[in-house]
């Protein structure tokens, strides 16, 4: 297994390609908004979102999911429930990706104990050919992107506040991604995952 950490060039122009495929692969856009706007967005999303603590079975017990979650529809009548700040964030995403996003899922990582295990997005809940757009706010956190089959490459990247990560639909077949726990002192982070869902899909 080979691990590739990315040290970003702060003066780089345009996106950084982490993984390549015929649908755009995985591209990282650092600093799509400045620090002041990213900080304001973080505070607004944190305070205006109806966060939920989900639980899940694990072996012989039920445990808390290690993060808070929420989700909103971006279109239709259900979009009225969306905090206004999300429309502003969605417009920024649209400036970098013209996919017709229909839903946004939010994760609130309160500290280094909160995480998400390696996974790929459920392809049956996505419209093929459209990417997933991930906006990061708050403290930086490392994402691990792991190839499922040999040579099982691992790409590690610190997702900075105000950044955008685009992951192709095709990438979900071949790679998992996750946010591991960390023992280092880190502040809270919010991620917003924009997706294109089939009609009548109520997921995030």
Predicted segments, located by residue:
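Non-heme Fe(II) oxygenase metal-center motifs and adjacent flexible, charged/small-residue loops
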Residues: 1-204
């Amino acid at each position: 297994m080979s691990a590739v950490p990315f040290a970003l060039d702060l003066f780089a122009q345009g996106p950084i390609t982490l993984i390549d495929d015929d649908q755009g692969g995985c591209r990282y856009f650092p600093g799509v908004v400045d620090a002041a706007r990213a900080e304001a967005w973080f505070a607004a999303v944190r305070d205006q979102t109806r966060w939920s603590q989900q639980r899940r079975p694990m072996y012989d017990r039920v445990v808390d999911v290690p993060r808070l979650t929420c989700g909103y529809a971006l279109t239709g009548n259900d979009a009225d429930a969306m905090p206004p700040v999300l429309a502003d964030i969605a417009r920024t995403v649209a400036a970098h990706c013209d996919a017709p996003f229909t839903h946004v899922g939010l994760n609130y990582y309160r500290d280094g104990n909160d995480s998400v295990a390696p996974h790929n997005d459920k392809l049956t809940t996505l419209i093929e050919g459209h990417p997933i757009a991930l906006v990061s706010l708050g403290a930086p956190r490392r994402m691990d992107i792991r190839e499922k089959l040999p040579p099982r490459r691992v790409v590690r990247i610190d997702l900075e506040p105000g950044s955008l990560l685009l992951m192709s639909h095709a990438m979900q077949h071949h790679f998992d991604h996750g946010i591991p726990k960390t023992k280092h002192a880190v502040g809270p982070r919010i991620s917003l995952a924009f997706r294109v869902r089939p009609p009548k899909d109520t997921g995030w």
